[in-house]
């Protein structure tokens, strides 16, 4: 019988590794420590309260991989709602379909994606926020949430007058049968298909990964897969964060040149990828060597 709970993994990891780097944006060099990440999660929980978010409500996320993308995901999971990660390379029709089909209540997007959201697909959406700085891009009723986000630091300091402490990192563990995420695949016919994953599903996968000792404090990982992809979602984000590892996010699937430079700069201990990316990298290296006569 499964006794562990993914949410408690995060609580323990964030407390234990509060001074360690959690996520780095490769292209902007922005770094979230585990303490910073926990702070952002706490601020998002306050925003969710202001939005009236409920347990069964869905929070959709689409955009370039960055530390705030991960913060929204972790905040949604630890709040007890359901996250809907959307692949950033899906076309506009698929993205609008997923927003509507999932009944998303809140949207977090890279700014360029807000321009493609259609009114009909966002009928149930209460508000949308930018993944660059969490400012409010849209709210259905008035400007309450816009004002709330504008003054979020004041609200945060009022909530934690003695400062945000590791002891304040505390998350209620939802039932293992609770739907934690709905991941949409590209499918072979028609629109994207949604796969519901429970807390128990994700806990089992993360627990197994942790048992293999792939991740831990001081372990560097290079995240190149879209976090909206279930493989990247679990192995480039959930499992490393549950173990105290340091994730460097490339933002999108890289070219062979960018990937080679990133590998040389980050020196990752663990890289999770798919055969297509490895093929691109090795093909480029082998072809260059053949053209220069290094390989005969």
Predicted regions span which residues?
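Conserved AMP-binding/adenylation subdomain of ANL enzymes
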Residues: 203-220, 227-296
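A short N-terminal helical cap/helix-turn-helix that marks the beginning
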Residues: 1-22, 39
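A short helix-loop-beta submotif of the ANL/AMP-binding
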Residues: 58, 64-84, 88-92, 100-106, ...
């Amino acid at each position: 019988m499964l006794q562990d709970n993914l949410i408690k993994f995060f609580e323990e990891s964030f407390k234990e590794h509060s001074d360690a780097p959690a996520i780095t944006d490769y292209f902007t060099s922005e770094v979230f420590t585990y303490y910073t990440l926990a702070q952002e999660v706490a601020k998002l929980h306050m925003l969710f309260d202001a939005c009236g978010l409920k347990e069964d409500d869905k929070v959709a996320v689409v955009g370039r991989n960055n530390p705030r993308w991960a913060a929204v995901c972790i905040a949604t999971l630890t709040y007890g709602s359901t996250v809907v990660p959307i692949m950033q390379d899906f076309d506009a029709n698929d993205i609008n379909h997923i927003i509507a089909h999932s009944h998303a209540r809140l949207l977090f997007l890279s700014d360029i994606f807000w321009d493609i959201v259609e009114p009909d697909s966002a009928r149930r959406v209460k508000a949308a926020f930018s993944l660059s700085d969490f400012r409010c891009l849209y709210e259905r009723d008035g400007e309450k949430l816009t004002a709330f986000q504008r003054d979020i630091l004041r609200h945060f300091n009022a909530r934690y007058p003695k400062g945000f402490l590791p002891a304040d990192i505390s998350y209620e563990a939802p039932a293992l049968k609770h739907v934690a995420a709905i991941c949409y695949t590209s499918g072979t016919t028609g629109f994207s298909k949604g796969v519901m994953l429970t807390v128990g599903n994700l806990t089992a996968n993360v627990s197994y990964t942790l048992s293999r000792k792939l991740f831990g404090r001081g372990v560097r990982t290079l995240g190149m897969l879209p976090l909206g992809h279930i493989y990247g979602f679990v192995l480039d984000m959930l499992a490393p964060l549950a173990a105290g590892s340091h994730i460097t996010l490339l933002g999108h699937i890289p070219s062979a040149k960018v990937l080679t430079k990133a590998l040389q700069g980050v020196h990752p201990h663990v890289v999770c990828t798919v055969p297509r990316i490895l093929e691109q990298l090795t093909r480029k290296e082998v072809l260059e060597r053949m053209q220069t006569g290094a390989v005969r």
